[in-house]
Each structure stands twice: as structure tokens, then as C-alpha cells.
């Protein structure tokens, strides 16, 4: 193998070298075929095939090709050149199998032709291909390692997060605390990635991240610096703290809120206890009153907060169970002219959507003051007995009745027994859904309480009795819906035989309205109104008018009375007064004379009240309500009887 380079040196005139085709790579096959066709002859090819000297010619051809390849691989290493003769021998054998002549120099070119596939491992241009495998083998771990590290590295500076770097910075300090600027300096000095990012332009991003992480993680605490004008210290939380984001808190909804389920459970228990209380017999008026939804005993203290949200102006002493429910004013100083309008109204009216004008806006303060003066009269005590009896009315429940005996009554004259004026819960049945009809204009008109006809003596006796407090004979006023000064006019005071009898609440019906021993005078008045073509009977108190009674000062106070609670008469007669103006009718005592001139043109603007919506949405909410709109009883005339109606007061 050492002789091959010497052959190259001694034979510089090797013929194929100056040929152009030997310098090209790879050698074009058409040119090689053309040279074979021009230089070779069929005879030598045939002779070579049969001549025994073909092996010698192949050997000489292989030697020549070896010299040729050695000239091409002058820059090759010795070990690479040692493999060349074998490759060339294979090429020569391939050329001999094709029938090329070994004696002619032309086949050397043919020998060169099969060599082109072989030179890649031996030629100078083929040196890079062996190198890349070794280089790839050597660089493989180097190239693969960055990819592995890049996938495992969390940040450009390494696997440590900002919080970890801040922790190392604080721990590296002697006092275990650093200011924000000192943390910046430690980052630039200690972390190679931030060494060239200390200027203001390139540091804005990572400094912001430092501040963000200091505030985000609870493991870092901020300590106020004692010096003035110095930034705070940042220290590690001695309790540890969390170094990650806290879990998101979802907004409470009806699905995942446990408070909603608890409130529903409490409401169910409260309703069950209320029903069990209704089943038990009542031994006192209070036990009977607790059956009513409007009763003070039917609401717990928790309900008052709910009622106050609907009626924020409920600030009277009737808004608490322990409040003193009395028509006698105990605090007159805090009663302003604008607060006299506060009257009791039924609980169903508490959920009326429309805002109604207050009574003080349409009333005369002087008349109200006169009424207060009459209510504050002093007189001798009277006896008041409370009894419980069953009402003969078919629709009446067992209700308390009250007997009122004036001390000055003679033995011959029968004492007016007020047990006839029973108050019960009216029986009602659902009202069919019918469109609202109004007989008059859409504006709600209000009448006036023309006259309060009663004897001052009887009024005095009632108000100054030594009997139990008046709240024993009062209606079960819902404390949540009573207005501030409901004790003035809204309490259901039983006055003399000719006195005004306010309603016992919206659910009360007056059973027997006439005193058989009373002296009556001819004359009566009526009002009729229709809602959906059906007449609704109002509860009327027909009280005797004696000749010895004097009139109180006329109270010219228009009262708003919604007709949303139809009452029924189960007594001697009905004094029906109905009128339809969006569910509000004229209220008051009506005589043959004309109304005062100041009440004729009184109309309240901007009053909307859809009776159908109230009946369907509000009244049907009560479980104990049962509506029954029967035919109106025939109107029976009572001579010169005074009419009062159930006052369903509407708040302002």
C-alpha cells in the first residue's frame, strides 16, 4: 500500500487527467457511453471475453485506476486511501462484466464510471460526509441537552421563579430584610441574566414582575421603615404563608349558596309552626288574633326586618309587638302636621306596587287637630268586658265580642250590647280572571268623611275607662304595615252607638250593625260601584242616631279606600257603598245634603291601582284567604242611619 503514492509520482502523464470529463463529478453517463462507442471495437470486446489474459488486463486496469484515484485523493488520509484499491477493484470487475476491453486505455474511463458511486467514502469531496456522522455523534448530546434543558427550565435565567429569587435575595442579606431597590440590585449582581438589564429601559419589565410577586405572595410581608422618606422593608413571613395564587372564590348563587337553603328551611319550619298554632283552640282574643296573617302574634322579630324593607317609613309604636296600640296620643309633641295621615291598612295593601299619595297631602291639618282634641277628652271610667262567642254568621269564625256598658245607663233602658258587633275573618273565594272595567273616568276620585256623628259623652267614657288598654279591643294591626301615627285614626275604636266604627282590618266583616233599641230617623244614602260588572258589598256600620247626640266638628279628610277587599254582610241589612275608580271609591258619611264645596272638585292625580293585579298577585298569596263574590244583598233602608265603611288605609 505504501507503493501506491510512488506510482503516482512516477507517472505524471497519466492520460485521463487532462480530460475534461475526469474533472467533472459525477461523470456524465452519455459522455462515457459515447467515448466507449468511439474508442472501443467489437472485436476486442469479444476477444476479451474469450481470451484467458482478461484477468491480467483487469489487474493492470485496476492498477491504473488506483493511480488515478490516488491523484484525486491527494488530500485524503492514509487510512481512507487504503480502502480505495478494493473499491476500484470492484469497479474494474463491474467494467469487465460489461465486456469492456482491458488493453485499451478507454476502458479506464469506463472504470472510472462505476467508481463515482464509490468515491463518496474516498474522494476529497466525500470527506465531509464521514465527518457529519462523527460530528453528529459528538454533538448529539450537546444538541439534545439544550432542548432538554429548555423544556425543564421555567425561565430564561433558570428554574427559579421570581418568588424564589426574591427569597434568596432576602435570605442573603444580614438583617433578613431588603428594600425594593436593594432587591433590584441583588438581581443585577447575582443573576447573570439580569446583569445587562439593569438600565431603566430594559429593567421595566422584570422590575414590575418583582413588585407583582412581592404583593402577590403571602410569604413576603411589608414592614414600615422607621426612617422618614424611606421605602418599606420586605421580609419573609415567619408564619410561612403561601407562595402561590389563592383559589378563586366563586360568586354565591342560589345553587351553591348554603344560606339560601337554610333560609328556606327556616321558612318551612315557621309556616309549620304557624299552622299548628292555628289548629289549637284559642283561650283568649290574643290566641284568636294569632291565627290571622295580619296579627302581631303571627310575625316573629325576624319578619320585621323584611317588612321594613317594603315599608321603610314604618316607625310608629305599632311596628313592634310590645308597642302601645291605643288611640290616645301619649306623645303629641312629635306629631307633625304631615304625620297625621299615618293610618292602618291591611297587610295585603302592603305589597301594592303603585305609590299612593299620602293623606297629609289631601287633608286639612286643622280638621285633624280638632279630631285629636275630641279624642283626648277626659271622662269617668267605664266598664269594658271581653267575651268570646260564636258568631251566627255562616262565614264568621269564632271571634271575640265586646260588651260596652256606660255607667249612667238607666235600669229601664237596655244597655247597648256591643257583642253584636262581631269581627271575624270573612270567607272569600277566588275571583275569576276578568279584565278591569271602570264606570267612571280613569282618575281616582275620593269622597270625604263628611260628618262624625257621635255623642261626646260616650266618646269620653270610652277613652277614659279604667279597663285594660285599648289594644285589647283593637284590630290585629300588622305592625309591619302600620304607619307612624296609626294610633290617631287607624285604630278600631268602638265608640258610642252613633260613633264611627272603623273597620277591624281588611278581612273583617261587621255582622250585626243595628241596635234594636235605638231610635232611628228616616233617610239613608247609597253608593254603588261595579268592578267587572259585579257589585262588591262594602262592610257598613249602621249606627243609631239619637236626638240627644251632638255632632262633632266635620272632618273634611278624603280617605283612600281600595276596594280590593270585598266584605260581606251577614246581618240585618247591608248598607252597600261601592264605587269604581280604579278600585277606589268615595268614603265617608253621606247625607242628602250636598258635599262641601271644597271637596267637590277634589281629585287625586297620578294614582294607578290595578285591582285585577292586586287580587291575583297580592291577595292570593295568603293561604287563609278565600274569596267569595256572592250576589249583593238587597239594599235595606234604615232611616237616617249613619254610614261608615271599612277603612283600608293606604300609606303615603
UniProtKB/Swiss-Prot annotation:
**Chief site of localization:** cytoplasm
Give positions of region: Disordered.
1-62, 112-154, 231-342, 383-410
- Listed result of changing residue 245 to R: Reduced acetylation and transcriptional activity increased by about 1.5-fold. Completely abolishes acetylation, increases interaction with CEBPA and transcriptional activity increased by about 3-fold
Omega-N-methylarginine (modified residue): where? 248, 250
Location of the region described as Sufficient for interaction with NLK in the Swiss-Prot/TrEMBL record? 280-562
Annotated segments matching region Required for interaction with RUNX2: 360-456
What are the entry keywords? Acetylation, Activator, Apoptosis, Autophagy, Cytoplasm, Differentiation, DNA-binding, Methylation, Nucleus, Phosphoprotein, Transcription, Transcription regulation, Ubl conjugation
Q: Where is this region: DNA-binding?
A: 208-215, 231-234
PROSITE patterns for the chain: FORK_HEAD_2, FORK_HEAD_3
* Impact when changing residue 291 to R: Transcriptional activity not inhibited by FCOR. Predominantly nuclear and translocates to the cytoplasm on insulin-stimulation
Fill in the PTM field for this protein: Phosphorylation by NLK promotes nuclear export and inhibits the transcriptional activity. In response to growth factors, phosphorylation on Thr-24, Ser-253 and Ser-319 by PKB/AKT1 promotes nuclear export and inactivation of transactivational activity. Phosphorylation on Thr-24 is required for binding 14-3-3 proteins. Phosphorylation of Ser-253 decreases DNA-binding activity and promotes the phosphorylation of Thr-24 and Ser-316, permitting phosphorylation of Ser-319 and Ser-322, probably by CDK1, leading to nuclear exclusion and loss of function. Ubiquitinated by SKP2. Ubiquitinated, leading to proteasomal degradation. Ubiquitinated by STUB1/CHIP; when Ser-253 is phosphorylated.
Q: Which residues carry this modification: Phosphothreonine?
A: 24, 330
| Effect ascribed to mutating residue 249 to K | No change in methylation levels
Variant or mutagenesis effect after changing residue 413 to A: Decreases phosphorylation by NLK
Functionally, this protein is described as follows:
Transcription factor that is the main target of insulin signaling and regulates metabolic homeostasis in response to oxidative stress. Binds to the insulin response element (IRE) with consensus sequence 5'-TT[G/A]TTTTG-3' and the related Daf-16 family binding element (DBE) with consensus sequence 5'-TT[G/A]TTTAC-3'. Activity suppressed by insulin. Main regulator of redox balance and osteoblast numbers and controls bone mass. Orchestrates the endocrine function of the skeleton in regulating glucose metabolism.
Known partners and oligomeric status: Interacts with EP300 and CREBBP; the interactions acetylate FOXO1. Interacts with the 14-3-3 proteins, YWHAG and YWHAZ; the interactions require insulin-stimulated phosphorylation on Thr-24, promote nuclear exit and loss of transcriptional activity. Interacts with SKP2; the interaction ubiquitinates FOXO1 leading to its proteasomal degradation. Interacts with PMRT1; methylates FOXO1, prevents PKB/AKT1 phosphorylation and retains FOXO1 in the nucleus.
- Its protein name is Forkhead box protein O1
- Species lineage, top-down? Eukaryota, Metazoa, Chordata, Craniata, Vertebrata
Q: Which gene encodes it?
A: Foxo1
Amino acid at each position: 500500500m505504501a507503493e501506491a503514492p510512488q506510482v503516482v509520482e512516477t507517472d505524471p502523464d497519466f492520460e485521463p487527467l487532462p480530460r475534461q470529463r475526469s474533472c467533472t463529478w459525477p461523470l456524465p453517463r452519455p459522455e462515457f457511453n459515447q467515448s466507449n462507442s468511439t474508442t472501443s471495437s467489437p472485436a476486442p470486446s469479444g476477444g476479451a471475453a474469450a481470451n484467458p489474459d482478461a484477468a491480467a488486463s483487469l489487474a493492470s486496469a485496476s492498477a491504473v485506476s488506483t493511480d488515478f484515484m490516488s491523484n484525486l485523493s491527494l488530500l485524503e488520509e492514509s487510512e481512507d486511501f487504503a480502502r480505495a484499491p478494493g473499491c476500484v477493484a470492484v469497479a474494474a470487475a463491474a467494467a469487465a462484466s460489461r465486456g469492456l476491453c482491458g488493453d485499451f486505455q478507454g476502458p479506464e474511463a469506463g472504470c472510472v464510471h462505476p467508481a463515482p458511486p464509490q468515491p463518496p467514502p474516498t474522494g476529497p469531496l466525500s470527506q465531509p460526509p464521514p465527518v457529519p456522522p462523527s460530528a453528529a455523534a459528538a454533538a448529539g448530546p450537546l444538541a439534545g441537552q439544550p432542548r432538554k434543558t429548555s423544556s425543564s427550565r421555567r425561565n430564561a435565567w433558570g428554574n427559579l421563579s421570581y418568588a424564589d429569587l426574591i427569597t434568596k435575595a432576602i435570605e442573603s442579606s444580614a438583617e433578613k430584610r431588603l428594600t425594593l431597590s436593594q432587591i433590584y440590585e441583588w438581581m443585577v449582581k447575582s443573576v447573570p441574566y439580569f446583569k445587562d438589564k439593569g438600565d431603566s429601559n430594559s429593567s421595566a419589565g422584570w422590575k414590575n414582575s418583582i413588585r407583582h410577586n412581592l404583593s402577590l405572595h403571602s410569604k413576603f410581608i411589608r414592614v414600615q421603615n422607621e426612617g422618614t422618606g424611606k421605602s418599606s422593608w420586605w421580609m419573609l413571613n415567619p408564619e410561612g404563608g403561601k407562595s402561590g395564587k389563592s383559589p378563586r372564590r366563586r360568586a354565591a348563587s342560589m345553587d351553591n349558596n348554603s344560606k339560601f337553603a337554610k333560609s328556606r328551611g327556616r321558612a318551612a319550619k315557621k309556616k309549620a309552626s304557624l299552622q299548628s298554632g292555628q289548629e289549637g283552640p284559642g283561650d283568649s282574643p290574643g290566641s284568636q288574633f294569632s291565627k290571622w296573617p295580619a296579627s302581631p302574634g303571627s310575625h316573629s322579630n325576624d319578619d320585621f326586618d323584611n317588612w321594613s324593607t317594603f315599608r321603610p317609613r314604618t316607625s310608629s309604636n305599632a311596628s313592634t309587638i310590645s308597642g302601645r296600640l291605643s288611640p290616645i296620643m301619649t306623645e303629641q309633641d312629635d306629631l307633625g302636621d304631615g304625620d297625621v295621615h299615618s293610618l292602618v291598612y291591611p297587610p295585603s295593601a302592603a305589597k301594592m306596587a303603585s305609590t299612593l299619595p299620602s293623606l297629609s297631602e289631601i287633608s286639612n291639618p286643622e280638621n285633624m287637630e280638632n279630631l285629636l282634641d275630641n279624642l283626648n277628652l277626659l271622662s269617668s271610667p267605664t266598664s269594658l268586658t271581653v267575651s268570646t262567642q260564636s258568631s251566627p254568621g255562616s262565614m264568621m269564625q269564632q271571634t271575640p265580642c265586646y260588651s260596652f256598658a256606660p255607667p249612667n245607663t238607666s235600669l229601664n233602658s237596655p244597655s247597648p250590647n256591643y257583642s253584636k258587633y262581631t269581627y271575624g275573618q270573612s270567607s272569600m273565594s277566588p275571583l275569576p280572571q276578568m279584565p278591569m272595567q271602570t264606570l267612571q273616568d280613569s282618575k281616582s276620585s275620593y269622597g270625604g268623611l263628611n260628618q262624625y256623628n257621635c255623642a261626646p259623652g260616650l266618646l269620653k267614657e270610652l277613652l277614659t275607662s279604667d279597663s285594660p288598654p285599648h289594644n285589647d279591643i283593637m284590630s290585629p294591626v300588622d305592625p309591619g304595615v302600620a304607619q307612624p301615627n296609626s294610633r290617631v285614626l287607624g285604630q278600631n275604636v268602638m265608640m258610642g252607638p252613633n260613633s264611627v266604627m272603623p273597620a277591624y282590618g281588611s278581612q273583617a266583616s261587621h255582622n250585626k250593625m243595628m241596635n234594636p233599641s235605638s231610635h232611628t230617623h228616616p233617610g239613608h244614602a247609597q253608593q254603588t260601584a261595579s268592578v267587572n260588572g259585579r257589585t262588591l258589598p262594602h262592610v257598613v256600620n249602621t249606627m243609631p242616631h239619637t236626638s240627644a247626640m251632638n255632632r262633632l266638628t266635620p272632618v273634611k279628610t278624603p280617605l283612600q279606600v281600595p276596594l280590593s277587599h270585598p266584605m260581606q254582610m251577614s246581618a240585618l241589612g247591608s248598607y252597600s257603598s261601592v264605587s269604581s275608580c280604579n278600585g277606589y271609591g268615595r268614603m265617608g258619611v253621606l247625607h242628602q245634603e250636598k258635599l262641601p264645596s271644597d271637596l267637590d272638585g277634589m281629585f287625586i292625580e297620578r294614582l294607578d291601582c290595578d285591582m285585577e293585579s292586586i287580587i291575583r298577585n297580592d291577595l292570593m298569596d295568603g293561604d287563609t284567604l278565600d274569596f267569595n263574590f256572592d250576589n249583593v244583598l238587597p239594599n235595606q233602608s234604615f232611616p237616617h242611619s249613619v254610614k261608615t265603611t271599612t277603612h283600608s288605609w293606604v300609606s303615603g
